[in-house]
């Protein structure tokens, strides 16, 4: 998804993030936008083993759970294990109150440019093992987007379930 995001404060405390489509309205988020709870439900209903949402929008209320995955250096056959387990992951371009930075000289947003560099050029293969995991991609984007946007936006990453799998890309 590339577009806008917004956050609505909930009456009972907390907040809910929304993705706003081109015909959506910030004055009517619930009826005209896609709530993160709905996005999470779609991920849970999917029969796919691995789901990664890449959201080129900034908002709060990330639909993630606070679990940690397996640790590569401490897990035998790490790639084998994370590829066998289900994964529901999300990476967003930034958080609540931030704006997606578009640079005309780049032709895309800072998030999209770094996403392409990370995957197409293999720059997100942090440990140089020939694979780019969702976690590696998130760490790469967090560093590069934050720097390239001059601290105006910082990508957020999370898991939508407690599953320990990860999306995996083969590095070129």
What does each model-identified segment do?
Residues 1-172:
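Cysteine endopeptidase catalytic domains of the caspase/legumain-like
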